Every structure is written in structure tokens, then in C-alpha cells.
């Protein structure tokens, strides 16, 4: 189990079932990125979402998920997802609209103000974790020291690398969900970690909610004029 190198998983006689996302949700997040992928830098997930070695960068943001509208927005307020070339050290917004994913960003590294990230691309289905159910990898209590959201029982699913062309690491990344459900019965999405263009990224989700006004932020969304474009984004899958 890949988590064994970091923490001892809580014994679970029967693996938990894969979680289902709520009909809508809002969550704040922090994203930590390190360009290091040498043997001295352990793969995520990291305690408190922070790698044990320098260098690394920490950013903030929020996500709004509304699959009934065919929409999801991820606002990265400090730096973007580390898959863009030559680097992603710029703020960005990635959103799904009308089966297309767009990137809004400043005019940096040939991006901006808006480009098409992917076509035929929609928010993840609410039951997307069912396809990964077999990759349950253990549960932890002690991933958080200063991050309360990580100091609870979390179930982890670690995905194998789908393409040998990306990197020589044995895994692509993983998902962490809190065992304790929300009042609605849905389980909060706590963590997502993955391999970037170089290095690793680890997102930690806080203030996850499936009720309240923030879950309706996309109700009146309209495609920005700057995104009426055929310009494709330059990124590395």
C-alpha cells in the first residue's frame, strides 16, 4: 500500500464503498506543488498537504460543482494546475460549459485571456469513483497535524498510472474522502493528489458543503465574451 510509507492505515475488514458526489457542492482548497520527483521526495499524500522537502509552492482557490447545469468552475487564485507549459505560475480559472473546458488566465506563457482546454469535456459524473472502487488503498486518521480536515478518518483510493509515456512512477495519483458523511449523507471530498507536468500536486479541500448559497453561484452563469474563441490551450496531458 502506497500510504504505508507515510502512515499506518486503519484496519478495515470490509473495504468502504466508493463515494458518490452530492448533486452540487462548493469547497475551498489549497494546492501545494513541488517540481521535485526524485527518490528523496516522497509521493503524496503529504501530512497537512505539505511536502517534507523544499522547494514547493502553496496556492489557494475554490471549486463549484453543478453537474445538473453541466458546469464546474475551479478558481486558482495564486497559480494554475501544474500541467501547462513551460510553467503554471499564474492565476487561472478552469471551467466546464456546454461540454467544453475553458481556461481563463492572464497573458502569460502564450495563454490568455481565454483558450479551450478540452472539447467534449464535462464535469465528472457524481458516481465517477465507482470505476476506481477496486483501488481502495487504506484509511488514515493522522494525515493532519495543523489541518483539521485531514485529522479524521479518511479513505483513500490510489490510481495506477494509465500511460507509461507520462512518467515511470507506478501511480497517477489518488483521492481521499472523509468517512464521516455530511448531514445529507454524502461524504466530503477531502484530498486529491496527482502527477503534474513535472513533480507532484496535492490539493486539500476545506469548507466542503452541499447546501447554501455558494452551491448556487453558477445558476446565472453566462459564457464570458473572451471565451468565444477557437484558440486551444498548450498543455501536457
Show where each model-derived region lies:
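Alpha-helix initiation/capping motif
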Residues: 15-26, 125, 146, 150, ...
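Exposed regions on extracellular, virion, or secretory-pathway luminal proteins
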Residues: 107-111, 121-128, 145-150, 162-169, ...
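An acidic-aromatic
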Residues: 53-133, 193-202
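Short acidic, Pro/Gly- and aromatic-enriched capping/linker segments at domain boundaries
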Residues: 127-152, 156, 204-215
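Short, solvent-exposed coil/turn segments at beta-strand boundaries
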Residues: 22-24, 62-73, 89-101, 150-154, ...
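Non-transmembrane domains of secretory- and envelope-associated proteins
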Residues: 3-16, 139, 166-171, 178-237
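Short beta-strand segments that buttress and anchor functional surface loops
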Residues: 29-31, 49, 73-79, 152-169, ...
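N-terminal leader/targeting segments and the immediate start of mature chains
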Residues: 1-71, 108-113, 119, 136-149, ...
